[in-house]
């Protein structure tokens, strides 16, 4: 078996990635989320495939086809709710994975980090288009509002929006193409994940100290396969509790009303995992400015290696930047809350304050804190 594992052209790739891979001996449970994201992707592709067998991407029948899946297909309700809540679990793992990367300075592995940012954008695009497919009120109006933001692009904006819509409003053509893209993107994401892993295995994993761990490596199997399996069990437990006991808790009641272009819902808002970005978008009165802030709220991650001023990689031994980091986490929670609130006093001013704080902490306060720590520890 050992000979096949190490010699066979295909199996040796798996061997070098998941079995004989040298891994740092001290990586904590924060390093579990990569494998959990892989599991989430697999769940989403499988449940999505079975949903696609019964779904029709036509404005006249889309809403009914989802109802049909839930009522008439064997375990269709389970597949549908696993897919909907699987997206939420996916984003929880994504945010924790990115948060881990920021905390421990993993962004210094630039190729892996940039690939991760591309993956984040791809997953967000996929989730957005998936939300449109049930063709409920929030699906329709969410699609209208978000695609309409592109009209803020000077000169080509309006033409671009109509081109994406396939007409003069969100309609049959839009739904069909969104279904096509929603179906193909997860497979593109899977390919990008392999590239992400390829880049990661060029440098090896980071670890909680942020120090070089070449002198102390252990094989991935059995140590981290077992450790990852515990994470899998915890995730599946949480996932099943969410899906079987509270399937609609993260959804919007408006999406149980069929799409009606003549009736606008009182509060148009995206799924919970986009609310922080939506709050940043709404906090700027100018349309183009809002769109740029929205994109920059994610794209700012790409500038993290440039904003790293400390002589140490991780935040493990850096209490000042640690404080900044947790304030940033709290700020993101505030933004998420504000994104779901109506546009009125006092929510407008809270959202604007939180948006300014978000960019200030990342671009100004954390780099300054890094320099202060260098001076305190006399690392200059």
Swiss-Prot record:
Its main location: mitochondrion. The chain crosses the membrane at residues 33-53, 77-98, 113-133, 178-198, 226-246, 288-308, 320-340, 347-367. The keyword Nucleus does not apply. It is found in: Mitochondrion inner membrane. A ubiquinone binds at residue 201. Pfam families: Cytochrom_B_C, Cytochrome_B. Keywords: Electron transport, Heme, Iron, Membrane, Metal-binding, Mitochondrion, Mitochondrion inner membrane, Respiratory chain, Transmembrane, Transmembrane helix, Transport, Ubiquinone. GO terms for molecular function: metal ion binding; ubiquinol-cytochrome-c reductase activity. Changing residue 303 to L: In strain: Isolate 3. Binds 2 heme b groups non-covalently. One of its GO terms (cellular component) is mitochondrial inner membrane. Component of the ubiquinol-cytochrome c reductase complex (complex III or cytochrome b-c1 complex) that is part of the mitochondrial respiratory chain. The b-c1 complex mediates electron transfer from ubiquinol to cytochrome c. Contributes to the generation of a proton gradient across the mitochondrial membrane that is then used for ATP synthesis. This is Cytochrome b.
């Amino acid at each position: 078996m050992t000979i096949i594992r190490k010699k066979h052209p295909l199996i040796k790739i798996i061997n070098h990635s998941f079995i004989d891979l040298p891994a740092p001996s001290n990586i904590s449970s924060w390093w579990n989320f990569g494998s959990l994201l892989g599991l989430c992707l697999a769940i989403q592709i499988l449940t999505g495939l079975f949903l696609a067998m019964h779904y029709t991407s036509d404005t006249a029948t889309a809403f009914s086809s989802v109802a049909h899946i839930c009522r008439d297909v064997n375990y269709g309700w389970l597949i549908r709710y696993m897919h909907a809540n699987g997206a939420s679990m996916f984003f929880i793992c994504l945010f924790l994975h990115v948060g881990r990367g920021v905390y421990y300075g993993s962004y210094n592995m630039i190729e892996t980090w940039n690939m991760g940012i591309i993956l984040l954008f791809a997953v967000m695009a996929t989730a957005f288009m998936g939300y449109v497919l049930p063709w409920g009120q929030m699906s329709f109006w969410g699609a209208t509002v978000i695609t309409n933001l592109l009209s803020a692009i000077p000169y080509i904006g309006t033409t671009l929006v109509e081109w994406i819509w396939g007409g003069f409003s969100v309609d049959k053509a839009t739904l069909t193409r969104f279904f096509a893209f929603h179906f193909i993107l997860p497979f593109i994401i899977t390919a990008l994940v392999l590239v992400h892993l390829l880049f990661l295995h060029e440098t090896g994993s980071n670890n909680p100290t942020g120090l070089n761990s070449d002198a102390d490596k252990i094989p991935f199997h059995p140590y981290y396969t077992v450790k990852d399996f515990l994470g899998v069990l915890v995730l599946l437990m949480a996932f099943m509790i969410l899906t079987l006991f509270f399937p609609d808790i993260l959804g919007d009641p408006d999406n149980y009303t069929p799409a009606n272009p003549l009736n606008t819902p009182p509060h148009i808002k995206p799924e919970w995992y986009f609310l922080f970005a939506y709050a940043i978008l709404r906090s700027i009165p100018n349309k183009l400015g809002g769109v740029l802030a929205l994109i920059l709220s994610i794209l700012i991650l790409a500038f993290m290696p440039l904003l790293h001023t400390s002589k140490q990689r991780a935040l493990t031994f850096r209490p000042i930047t640690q404080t900044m980091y947790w304030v940033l986490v709290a700020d993101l929670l505030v933004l998420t809350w504000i994104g779901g609130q109506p546009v009125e006093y006092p929510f407008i001013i809270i959202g604007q304050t939180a948006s300014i704080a978000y960019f200030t902490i990342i671009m100004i306060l954390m780099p300054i804190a890094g320099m202060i720590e260098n001076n305190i520890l006399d690392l200059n």
